[in-house]
Swiss-Prot record:
Keywords carried by this UniProt record: ATP-binding, Helicase, Hydrolase, Nucleotide-binding, RNA-binding, Transcription, Transcription regulation, Transcription termination
Gene expressing this chain: rho
UniProt key word Cell membrane: no
InterPro entries referenced in this protein's UniProt entry, alphabetically: AAA+_ATPase, ATPase_F1/V1/A1_a/bsu_nucl-bd, CSD, NA-bd_OB-fold, P-loop_NTPase, Rho-like_N, Rho_factor_ATP-bd, Rho_N_sf
Residues engaged in binding ATP: 259-264, 271-276, 302
Name of protein: Transcription termination factor Rho
Keyword set includes RNA-binding: yes
EC class name: hydrolase
Primary role: Facilitates transcription termination by a mechanism that involves Rho binding to the nascent RNA, activation of Rho's RNA-dependent ATPase activity, and release of the mRNA from the DNA template.
Protein backbone atom coordinates (compact mmCIF):
# COMPACT_ATOMS: atom_id res chain seq x y z
CA UNK A 1 0.00 0.00 0.00
CA UNK A 2 1.20 3.53 -0.79
CA UNK A 3 2.57 5.35 2.32
CA UNK A 4 0.18 8.26 1.82
CA UNK A 5 -2.81 5.91 1.93
CA UNK A 6 -1.45 4.17 5.03
CA UNK A 7 -1.28 7.53 6.77
CA UNK A 8 -4.94 8.07 6.05
CA UNK A 9 -6.04 4.98 7.98
CA UNK A 10 -3.53 5.23 10.82
CA UNK A 11 -5.49 6.15 14.01
CA UNK A 12 -4.44 9.34 15.81
CA UNK A 13 -2.48 9.04 19.06
CA UNK A 14 -3.80 10.56 22.30
CA UNK A 15 -2.31 10.52 25.79
CA UNK A 16 -5.80 10.72 27.28
CA UNK A 17 -8.79 9.78 25.14
CA UNK A 18 -12.47 9.07 24.92
CA UNK A 19 -13.82 6.58 22.43
CA UNK A 20 -16.22 9.26 21.22
CA UNK A 21 -13.35 11.57 20.23
CA UNK A 22 -12.07 8.96 17.78
CA UNK A 23 -15.12 9.27 15.52
CA UNK A 24 -14.30 11.14 12.30
CA UNK A 25 -16.55 13.73 10.68
CA UNK A 26 -18.00 12.92 7.23
CA UNK A 27 -15.81 14.13 4.42
CA UNK A 28 -16.52 14.99 0.85
CA UNK A 29 -13.06 13.87 -0.23
CA UNK A 30 -13.56 11.58 -3.22
CA UNK A 31 -11.68 8.48 -4.21
CA UNK A 32 -9.75 5.90 -2.19
CA UNK A 33 -9.04 8.32 0.63
CA UNK A 34 -12.76 8.69 1.35
CA UNK A 35 -13.24 4.90 1.33
CA UNK A 36 -10.30 4.52 3.69
CA UNK A 37 -11.82 7.03 6.10
CA UNK A 38 -15.16 5.23 6.02
CA UNK A 39 -13.38 1.96 6.78
CA UNK A 40 -11.46 3.62 9.58
CA UNK A 41 -14.69 5.03 10.99
CA UNK A 42 -16.29 1.58 11.01
CA UNK A 43 -13.25 0.11 12.78
CA UNK A 44 -13.31 2.69 15.54
CA UNK A 45 -17.03 2.88 16.11
CA UNK A 46 -17.65 1.51 19.62
CA UNK A 47 -20.30 -1.01 20.36
CA UNK A 48 -23.13 -0.15 22.70
CA UNK A 49 -21.27 -1.32 25.85
CA UNK A 50 -17.97 0.49 25.24
CA UNK A 51 -19.11 3.89 26.55
CA UNK A 52 -20.39 2.29 29.71
CA UNK A 53 -17.09 0.50 30.33
CA UNK A 54 -15.09 3.69 29.71
CA UNK A 55 -17.23 5.59 32.22
CA UNK A 56 -16.56 2.85 34.76
CA UNK A 57 -12.83 3.10 34.18
CA UNK A 58 -12.93 6.92 34.42
CA UNK A 59 -14.68 6.59 37.78
CA UNK A 60 -11.89 4.22 38.88
CA UNK A 61 -14.28 1.42 39.75
CA UNK A 62 -13.43 -2.24 39.49
CA UNK A 63 -15.07 -3.94 36.49
CA UNK A 64 -17.74 -6.49 37.21
CA UNK A 65 -16.71 -10.09 37.24
CA UNK A 66 -18.38 -12.47 34.79
CA UNK A 67 -20.69 -13.98 37.46
CA UNK A 68 -21.71 -10.48 38.59
CA UNK A 69 -22.43 -9.46 34.99
CA UNK A 70 -24.78 -12.44 34.72
CA UNK A 71 -26.64 -11.32 37.84
CA UNK A 72 -26.78 -7.75 36.52
CA UNK A 73 -28.18 -8.82 33.15
CA UNK A 74 -30.81 -11.10 34.71
CA UNK A 75 -31.88 -8.40 37.17
CA UNK A 76 -32.06 -5.78 34.38
CA UNK A 77 -34.29 -8.12 32.38
CA UNK A 78 -36.73 -8.33 35.26
CA UNK A 79 -35.73 -11.75 36.53
CA UNK A 80 -34.65 -12.81 40.00
CA UNK A 81 -31.48 -14.80 40.48
CA UNK A 82 -31.41 -17.85 42.69
CA UNK A 83 -35.17 -18.16 43.29
CA UNK A 84 -36.19 -21.83 43.09
CA UNK A 85 -39.23 -22.96 41.18
CA UNK A 86 -42.55 -23.09 43.01
CA UNK A 87 -42.76 -26.86 42.69
CA UNK A 88 -39.30 -27.32 44.17
CA UNK A 89 -39.42 -29.55 47.22
CA UNK A 90 -37.62 -28.60 50.47
CA UNK A 91 -35.29 -31.53 49.92
CA UNK A 92 -34.21 -30.09 46.57
CA UNK A 93 -33.54 -26.70 48.20
CA UNK A 94 -30.54 -28.01 50.15
CA UNK A 95 -27.53 -25.73 49.87
CA UNK A 96 -23.99 -26.90 49.30
CA UNK A 97 -23.17 -27.02 53.02
CA UNK A 98 -26.13 -29.28 53.76
CA UNK A 99 -24.79 -31.79 51.25
CA UNK A 100 -21.27 -31.59 52.68
CA UNK A 101 -22.57 -32.52 56.14
CA UNK A 102 -24.22 -35.75 54.95
CA UNK A 103 -22.54 -39.12 55.46
CA UNK A 104 -21.35 -41.15 52.48
CA UNK A 105 -24.24 -43.63 52.72
CA UNK A 106 -26.75 -40.78 52.81
CA UNK A 107 -25.15 -39.21 49.74
CA UNK A 108 -25.34 -42.52 47.85
CA UNK A 109 -29.01 -42.93 48.71
CA UNK A 110 -29.72 -39.36 47.63
CA UNK A 111 -27.85 -39.85 44.35
CA UNK A 112 -29.81 -43.02 43.58
CA UNK A 113 -33.07 -41.21 44.32
CA UNK A 114 -32.15 -38.47 41.86
CA UNK A 115 -31.16 -40.96 39.15
CA UNK A 116 -27.39 -40.49 39.00
CA UNK A 117 -25.48 -43.30 37.29
CA UNK A 118 -22.08 -44.90 38.03
CA UNK A 119 -21.76 -43.53 41.54
CA UNK A 120 -20.79 -46.59 43.60
CA UNK A 121 -17.02 -46.05 43.28
CA UNK A 122 -17.02 -42.26 43.58
CA UNK A 123 -15.23 -40.66 46.56
CA UNK A 124 -17.27 -38.50 48.88
CA UNK A 125 -16.15 -35.13 47.47
CA UNK A 126 -16.81 -36.19 43.87
CA UNK A 127 -20.25 -37.49 44.87
CA UNK A 128 -21.16 -34.12 46.37
CA UNK A 129 -19.93 -32.44 43.19
CA UNK A 130 -22.11 -34.67 40.98
CA UNK A 131 -25.18 -34.07 43.15
CA UNK A 132 -24.68 -30.32 43.05
CA UNK A 133 -24.31 -30.24 39.27
CA UNK A 134 -27.44 -32.35 38.82
CA UNK A 135 -29.52 -30.16 41.12
CA UNK A 136 -28.29 -26.89 39.68
CA UNK A 137 -28.94 -28.00 36.11
CA UNK A 138 -32.53 -28.77 37.13
CA UNK A 139 -33.24 -25.90 39.51
CA UNK A 140 -30.85 -23.08 38.60
CA UNK A 141 -28.70 -21.32 41.17
CA UNK A 142 -28.01 -22.54 44.68
CA UNK A 143 -26.67 -21.15 47.92
CA UNK A 144 -23.16 -21.79 49.24
CA UNK A 145 -20.75 -20.61 51.88
CA UNK A 146 -17.25 -21.31 53.13
CA UNK A 147 -13.98 -19.91 54.41
CA UNK A 148 -12.06 -17.90 51.84
CA UNK A 149 -8.50 -18.79 50.88
CA UNK A 150 -6.88 -16.23 48.57
CA UNK A 151 -4.22 -17.66 46.28
CA UNK A 152 -1.13 -15.75 45.07
CA UNK A 153 -2.76 -15.13 41.67
CA UNK A 154 -5.40 -12.89 43.27
CA UNK A 155 -8.47 -15.11 43.05
CA UNK A 156 -9.72 -17.34 45.84
CA UNK A 157 -11.81 -20.35 46.79
CA UNK A 158 -14.32 -20.98 49.54
CA UNK A 159 -13.07 -24.02 51.48
CA UNK A 160 -15.18 -26.20 53.76
CA UNK A 161 -14.40 -27.06 57.37
CA UNK A 162 -16.02 -30.44 56.69
CA UNK A 163 -12.97 -31.28 54.56
CA UNK A 164 -10.49 -29.60 56.92
CA UNK A 165 -10.02 -26.78 54.37
CA UNK A 166 -8.60 -29.16 51.77
CA UNK A 167 -8.98 -28.37 48.08
CA UNK A 168 -12.05 -30.26 46.81
CA UNK A 169 -14.11 -30.43 43.59
CA UNK A 170 -17.03 -28.60 45.25
CA UNK A 171 -14.97 -25.54 46.26
CA UNK A 172 -16.47 -22.22 45.16
CA UNK A 173 -14.46 -19.83 43.00
CA UNK A 174 -14.30 -16.15 44.07
CA UNK A 175 -13.18 -13.62 41.47
CA UNK A 176 -10.47 -10.98 42.11
CA UNK A 177 -12.95 -8.14 41.54
CA UNK A 178 -15.22 -9.45 44.32
CA UNK A 179 -12.22 -9.77 46.64
CA UNK A 180 -11.14 -6.18 45.94
CA UNK A 181 -14.61 -4.66 46.13
CA UNK A 182 -15.47 -6.07 49.56
CA UNK A 183 -11.94 -5.98 51.01
CA UNK A 184 -11.89 -9.72 51.63
CA UNK A 185 -8.98 -11.48 53.29
CA UNK A 186 -8.03 -15.10 53.80
CA UNK A 187 -10.17 -16.50 56.60
CA UNK A 188 -13.31 -14.47 55.83
CA UNK A 189 -16.51 -16.50 55.98
CA UNK A 190 -18.40 -15.69 52.78
CA UNK A 191 -21.93 -16.74 51.84
CA UNK A 192 -23.90 -16.11 48.67
CA UNK A 193 -25.47 -17.46 45.51
CA UNK A 194 -23.43 -19.75 43.27
CA UNK A 195 -23.67 -21.09 39.74
CA UNK A 196 -22.46 -24.40 38.26
CA UNK A 197 -19.22 -24.63 36.27
CA UNK A 198 -19.42 -24.13 32.52
CA UNK A 199 -17.96 -26.48 29.92
CA UNK A 200 -14.40 -25.20 30.27
CA UNK A 201 -14.56 -24.63 34.05
CA UNK A 202 -13.86 -26.94 36.97
CA UNK A 203 -15.39 -25.17 39.96
CA UNK A 204 -18.62 -23.57 41.08
CA UNK A 205 -18.52 -19.76 40.97
CA UNK A 206 -19.80 -17.21 43.45
CA UNK A 207 -22.42 -15.01 41.78
CA UNK A 208 -23.39 -12.60 44.52
CA UNK A 209 -22.06 -12.09 48.05
CA UNK A 210 -24.88 -11.92 50.59
CA UNK A 211 -22.98 -12.13 53.90
CA UNK A 212 -19.42 -11.75 55.15
CA UNK A 213 -18.68 -13.22 58.58
CA UNK A 214 -22.46 -13.66 59.08
CA UNK A 215 -23.06 -9.90 58.67
CA UNK A 216 -23.96 -7.43 55.95
CA UNK A 217 -21.19 -7.24 53.31
CA UNK A 218 -20.87 -3.46 53.62
CA UNK A 219 -20.24 -3.74 57.37
CA UNK A 220 -16.92 -5.47 56.65
CA UNK A 221 -15.50 -2.24 55.21
CA UNK A 222 -16.04 -0.45 58.54
CA UNK A 223 -14.10 -2.99 60.64
CA UNK A 224 -10.55 -2.38 61.81
CA UNK A 225 -7.93 -4.91 60.66
CA UNK A 226 -6.74 -7.37 63.29
CA UNK A 227 -3.22 -5.92 63.43
CA UNK A 228 -4.64 -2.45 64.21
CA UNK A 229 -6.69 -3.64 67.21
CA UNK A 230 -5.40 -2.71 70.68
CA UNK A 231 -4.13 -5.72 72.71
CA UNK A 232 -4.83 -5.86 76.46
CA UNK A 233 -4.12 -8.17 79.37
CA UNK A 234 -6.84 -10.83 79.78
CA UNK A 235 -9.42 -9.59 82.29
CA UNK A 236 -12.45 -11.82 81.68
CA UNK A 237 -12.07 -15.28 83.18
CA UNK A 238 -12.89 -18.54 81.39
CA UNK A 239 -14.37 -20.97 83.92
CA UNK A 240 -13.93 -24.50 82.56
CA UNK A 241 -15.46 -26.33 85.54
CA UNK A 242 -18.58 -28.14 84.33
CA UNK A 243 -18.66 -31.49 86.15
CA UNK A 244 -17.90 -32.20 89.81
CA UNK A 245 -16.13 -35.43 88.85
CA UNK A 246 -14.00 -33.75 86.15
CA UNK A 247 -11.12 -32.84 88.44
CA UNK A 248 -8.72 -31.68 85.71
CA UNK A 249 -10.79 -28.60 84.84
CA UNK A 250 -11.33 -27.81 88.51
CA UNK A 251 -7.58 -27.92 89.16
CA UNK A 252 -6.89 -25.70 86.15
CA UNK A 253 -9.46 -23.12 87.29
CA UNK A 254 -7.79 -22.88 90.70
CA UNK A 255 -4.07 -22.98 89.92
CA UNK A 256 -3.83 -21.78 86.31
CA UNK A 257 -6.91 -19.61 85.66
CA UNK A 258 -7.55 -18.93 81.97
CA UNK A 259 -8.82 -15.64 80.57
CA UNK A 260 -10.22 -14.66 77.19
CA UNK A 261 -7.16 -13.68 75.17
CA UNK A 262 -4.77 -15.99 77.02
CA UNK A 263 -1.66 -17.34 75.31
CA UNK A 264 -0.93 -20.60 77.09
CA UNK A 265 1.38 -23.58 76.82
CA UNK A 266 0.57 -27.09 78.01
CA UNK A 267 4.05 -28.54 78.54
CA UNK A 268 3.79 -32.30 78.27
CA UNK A 269 6.04 -35.36 78.08
CA UNK A 270 4.76 -38.35 76.04
CA UNK A 271 1.63 -40.14 77.33
CA UNK A 272 0.97 -37.58 80.05
CA UNK A 273 -2.72 -37.05 79.28
CA UNK A 274 -2.51 -33.79 77.31
CA UNK A 275 -5.18 -34.91 74.82
CA UNK A 276 -7.65 -35.78 77.59
CA UNK A 277 -6.91 -32.46 79.30
CA UNK A 278 -7.62 -30.54 76.09
CA UNK A 279 -10.89 -32.42 75.61
CA UNK A 280 -12.01 -31.54 79.12
CA UNK A 281 -11.09 -27.87 78.70
CA UNK A 282 -12.87 -27.66 75.34
CA UNK A 283 -16.04 -29.21 76.77
CA UNK A 284 -15.91 -26.75 79.65
CA UNK A 285 -15.68 -23.74 77.34
CA UNK A 286 -18.54 -24.99 75.15
CA UNK A 287 -20.78 -25.76 78.14
CA UNK A 288 -20.19 -22.48 79.97
CA UNK A 289 -19.85 -20.02 77.07
CA UNK A 290 -22.31 -20.77 74.25
CA UNK A 291 -21.33 -17.59 72.38
CA UNK A 292 -17.63 -18.49 72.25
CA UNK A 293 -16.27 -20.31 69.20
CA UNK A 294 -13.93 -23.26 69.81
CA UNK A 295 -11.47 -24.70 67.29
CA UNK A 296 -9.47 -27.86 68.03
CA UNK A 297 -6.48 -27.90 65.66
CA UNK A 298 -4.61 -31.21 65.47
CA UNK A 299 -1.27 -31.08 63.63
CA UNK A 300 0.72 -34.22 62.70
CA UNK A 301 -1.67 -36.32 64.79
CA UNK A 302 -2.73 -39.95 64.49
CA UNK A 303 -5.99 -40.52 62.54
CA UNK A 304 -7.62 -42.43 65.40
CA UNK A 305 -6.96 -39.50 67.73
CA UNK A 306 -8.71 -37.21 65.26
CA UNK A 307 -11.78 -39.46 65.15
CA UNK A 308 -11.90 -39.65 68.94
CA UNK A 309 -11.71 -35.86 69.25
CA UNK A 310 -14.47 -35.37 66.67
CA UNK A 311 -16.78 -37.73 68.56
CA UNK A 312 -16.01 -36.37 72.01
CA UNK A 313 -16.47 -32.71 71.10
CA UNK A 314 -19.58 -32.03 69.04
CA UNK A 315 -21.18 -28.61 68.93
CA UNK A 316 -22.36 -26.08 66.32
CA UNK A 317 -19.86 -23.70 67.95
CA UNK A 318 -16.89 -26.05 67.54
CA UNK A 319 -14.64 -27.20 64.71
CA UNK A 320 -12.16 -30.08 64.83
CA UNK A 321 -9.60 -29.42 62.09
CA UNK A 322 -6.73 -31.82 61.51
CA UNK A 323 -3.73 -32.61 59.36
CA UNK A 324 -2.57 -36.12 60.18
CA UNK A 325 1.01 -37.38 60.28
CA UNK A 326 0.76 -38.88 56.78
CA UNK A 327 0.23 -35.42 55.27
CA UNK A 328 3.17 -33.35 53.96
CA UNK A 329 4.54 -30.42 56.02
CA UNK A 330 3.07 -27.93 53.54
CA UNK A 331 -0.39 -29.25 54.40
CA UNK A 332 0.26 -28.75 58.14
CA UNK A 333 1.26 -25.15 57.47
CA UNK A 334 -1.71 -24.42 55.21
CA UNK A 335 -4.35 -25.71 57.61
CA UNK A 336 -2.81 -23.91 60.61
CA UNK A 337 -2.68 -20.61 58.76
CA UNK A 338 -6.27 -21.01 57.56
CA UNK A 339 -7.54 -21.64 61.09
CA UNK A 340 -5.67 -18.67 62.57
CA UNK A 341 -6.71 -16.32 59.75
CA UNK A 342 -10.35 -17.34 60.19
CA UNK A 343 -10.05 -16.72 63.93
CA UNK A 344 -8.64 -13.24 63.25
CA UNK A 345 -11.58 -12.35 61.03
CA UNK A 346 -13.98 -13.50 63.75
CA UNK A 347 -12.16 -11.40 66.37
CA UNK A 348 -12.49 -8.37 64.08
CA UNK A 349 -16.25 -8.98 64.24
CA UNK A 350 -16.19 -9.06 68.06
CA UNK A 351 -16.28 -12.83 68.64
CA UNK A 352 -14.41 -14.68 71.40
CA UNK A 353 -12.44 -17.51 69.76
CA UNK A 354 -10.60 -20.28 71.63
CA UNK A 355 -8.07 -22.44 69.74
CA UNK A 356 -6.70 -25.67 71.21
CA UNK A 357 -3.53 -26.46 69.23
CA UNK A 358 -1.94 -29.91 69.47
CA UNK A 359 0.89 -29.46 69.04
CA UNK A 360 2.90 -26.34 68.42
CA UNK A 361 6.07 -28.44 68.48
CA UNK A 362 4.96 -30.43 65.44
CA UNK A 363 3.86 -27.25 63.71
CA UNK A 364 7.32 -25.79 64.22
CA UNK A 365 8.81 -28.98 62.79
CA UNK A 366 6.67 -28.50 59.67
CA UNK A 367 7.92 -24.93 59.23
CA UNK A 368 11.47 -26.20 59.71
CA UNK A 369 10.93 -28.65 56.83
CA UNK A 370 9.41 -25.97 54.60
CA UNK A 371 11.86 -24.61 52.04
CA UNK A 372 10.25 -21.15 52.10
CA UNK A 373 11.28 -20.68 55.74
CA UNK A 374 14.83 -22.00 55.31
CA UNK A 375 17.76 -19.62 55.75
CA UNK A 376 20.54 -22.20 55.67
CA UNK A 377 21.67 -21.35 59.20
CA UNK A 378 21.14 -24.26 61.58
CA UNK A 379 20.77 -24.01 65.35
CA UNK A 380 21.23 -26.76 67.91
CA UNK A 381 19.27 -29.89 67.05
CA UNK A 382 19.07 -29.11 63.34
CA UNK A 383 16.53 -26.29 63.72
CA UNK A 384 16.76 -23.65 61.00
CA UNK A 385 17.29 -20.11 62.27
CA UNK A 386 14.24 -18.79 60.39
CA UNK A 387 11.89 -21.67 61.10
CA UNK A 388 10.47 -20.21 64.32
CA UNK A 389 9.35 -16.86 62.96
CA UNK A 390 5.97 -17.97 61.56
CA UNK A 391 5.05 -20.35 64.43
CA UNK A 392 5.75 -17.50 66.85
CA UNK A 393 3.56 -15.23 64.73
CA UNK A 394 0.71 -17.76 64.95
CA UNK A 395 1.12 -18.20 68.70
CA UNK A 396 1.48 -14.45 69.19
CA UNK A 397 -1.88 -13.82 67.56
CA UNK A 398 -3.61 -14.68 70.85
CA UNK A 399 -4.78 -11.51 72.58
CA UNK A 400 -7.67 -9.68 74.15
CA UNK A 401 -8.51 -6.56 72.16
CA UNK A 402 -9.94 -3.33 73.48
CA UNK A 403 -12.42 -2.98 70.62
CA UNK A 404 -14.14 -6.26 71.58
CA UNK A 405 -13.50 -9.92 70.92
CA UNK A 406 -10.53 -12.07 71.83
CA UNK A 407 -8.35 -14.87 70.50
CA UNK A 408 -7.25 -17.47 73.04
CA UNK A 409 -4.66 -20.09 72.09
CA UNK A 410 -3.80 -23.05 74.33
CA UNK A 411 -1.04 -25.04 72.62
CA UNK A 412 0.77 -28.18 73.71
CA UNK A 413 4.58 -28.22 73.70
CA UNK A 414 6.32 -31.62 73.72
CA UNK A 415 9.30 -32.24 76.02
CA UNK A 416 11.34 -35.30 77.03
CA UNK A 417 10.80 -36.90 73.63
CA UNK A 418 14.46 -37.74 73.11
CA UNK A 419 14.71 -35.16 70.33
CA UNK A 420 17.04 -32.24 70.84
CA UNK A 421 15.02 -30.23 68.32
CA UNK A 422 11.88 -30.52 70.45
CA UNK A 423 13.75 -29.15 73.47
CA UNK A 424 15.04 -26.21 71.43
CA UNK A 425 11.54 -25.47 70.12
CA UNK A 426 10.16 -25.45 73.67
CA UNK A 427 12.92 -23.09 74.82
CA UNK A 428 12.04 -20.74 71.95
CA UNK A 429 8.40 -20.59 73.05
CA UNK A 430 9.12 -20.49 76.76
CA UNK A 431 8.40 -17.01 78.02
CA UNK A 432 6.28 -15.98 75.03
CA UNK A 433 3.05 -17.14 76.69
CA UNK A 434 1.30 -15.82 79.77
CA UNK A 435 0.16 -19.22 81.08
CA UNK A 436 1.86 -22.57 81.58
CA UNK A 437 0.35 -25.90 82.55
CA UNK A 438 3.18 -28.35 83.21
CA UNK A 439 2.44 -32.08 83.17
CA UNK A 440 4.80 -34.20 85.27
CA UNK A 441 6.31 -37.56 84.27
CA UNK A 442 6.47 -38.79 87.88
CA UNK A 443 2.73 -38.28 88.29
CA UNK A 444 2.17 -40.23 85.08
CA UNK A 445 4.34 -43.09 86.36
CA UNK A 446 2.29 -43.19 89.59
CA UNK A 447 -0.96 -43.08 87.58
CA UNK A 448 -2.08 -39.88 89.29
CA UNK A 449 -4.47 -37.86 87.12
CA UNK A 450 -4.51 -35.03 86.30
CA UNK A 451 -0.71 -35.13 86.12
CA UNK A 452 -0.26 -31.38 86.69
CA UNK A 453 2.81 -30.10 88.52
CA UNK A 454 1.19 -27.47 90.74
CA UNK A 455 4.43 -25.71 91.73
CA UNK A 456 5.60 -25.15 88.14
CA UNK A 457 2.21 -24.26 86.66
CA UNK A 458 0.71 -20.81 86.81
CA UNK A 459 -0.75 -17.73 85.10
CA UNK A 460 0.82 -14.29 84.73
CA UNK A 461 -1.22 -11.52 86.35
CA UNK A 462 -3.70 -14.04 87.72
CA UNK A 463 -4.94 -11.45 90.22
CA UNK A 464 -6.67 -9.70 87.30
CA UNK A 465 -8.80 -12.81 86.73
CA UNK A 466 -9.58 -13.83 90.32
CA UNK A 467 -11.71 -12.29 93.02
CA UNK A 468 -9.63 -10.82 95.84
CA UNK A 469 -10.87 -13.25 98.49
CA UNK A 470 -10.61 -16.16 96.07
CA UNK A 471 -7.02 -15.17 95.30
CA UNK A 472 -6.12 -15.11 99.02
CA UNK A 473 -7.48 -18.60 99.60
CA UNK A 474 -5.70 -20.01 96.53
CA UNK A 475 -2.42 -18.47 97.69
CA UNK A 476 -2.86 -20.17 101.06
CA UNK A 477 -3.56 -23.48 99.34
CA UNK A 478 -0.45 -23.09 97.18
CA UNK A 479 1.77 -22.50 100.20
CA UNK A 480 0.39 -25.56 101.97
CA UNK A 481 0.92 -27.84 98.95
CA UNK A 482 4.39 -26.46 98.15
CA UNK A 483 5.76 -28.16 101.29
CA UNK A 484 5.18 -31.59 99.71
CA UNK A 485 6.45 -33.34 96.59
CA UNK A 486 4.44 -32.98 93.35
CA UNK A 487 3.04 -36.50 93.75
CA UNK A 488 1.99 -35.99 97.37
CA UNK A 489 0.59 -32.52 96.62
CA UNK A 490 -1.66 -33.72 93.82
CA UNK A 491 -2.74 -36.82 95.74
CA UNK A 492 -3.77 -34.71 98.73
CA UNK A 493 -5.52 -32.14 96.56
CA UNK A 494 -7.56 -34.78 94.71
CA UNK A 495 -8.61 -36.38 97.98
CA UNK A 496 -9.90 -33.07 99.34
CA UNK A 497 -11.60 -31.97 96.12
CA UNK A 498 -13.57 -35.21 95.78
CA UNK A 499 -15.36 -34.37 99.01
CA UNK A 500 -16.91 -31.24 97.49
CA UNK A 501 -19.23 -30.64 94.55
CA UNK A 502 -17.53 -27.57 93.09
CA UNK A 503 -14.59 -25.22 93.56
CA UNK A 504 -16.59 -22.63 95.48
CA UNK A 505 -17.46 -25.19 98.14
CA UNK A 506 -13.87 -26.42 98.18
CA UNK A 507 -12.40 -22.93 98.70
CA UNK A 508 -14.74 -22.33 101.63
CA UNK A 509 -12.89 -25.12 103.42
CA UNK A 510 -9.56 -23.31 102.93
CA UNK A 511 -8.80 -20.81 105.69
CA UNK A 512 -6.69 -17.93 104.38
CA UNK A 513 -3.63 -16.79 106.31
CA UNK A 514 -3.08 -13.12 107.08
Amino acid sequence: MHPSRMALIRPPLFSSYRFGSLLMEPSSTPGPARNARRSNRRMRHPDKDVDKRVRELDAERDPLSLPEEIVSEVTRAGGRVGIPAKDQSPKQALNINDLQKLEHDELLALAETEGLQEIAALPRQELVFRLLKARMSANGLMYGEGTLEILPDGFGFLRSAQYHYLSCPDDIYVSPSQIRRFGLHTGSHVAGQIRPPKENERYFALLRIEAINHADPMQRQRQKPFDDLTPLHPRTRIVTEHDSQELSTRVVDLFTPIGFGQRGLIVSPPRAGKTMLMQSLARGVLNNYPDAYVVVLLIDERPEEVTDMEREIQSPQCEVISSTFDEPPARHIQVAQMVVEKAKRMVESGTDVVIFLDSITRLARAFNSDSDSATGKLLTGGLDAGAMQKPKSIFGSARKVEEGGSLTILATALVDTGSRMDDVIFEEFKGTGNLEIVLDQDLVARRVWPAIDLTRSGTRREEMLLDQEEHRRIETLRRDLAEHSPVDSMTELIKRMRKTQNNAEFLMSVHPQD
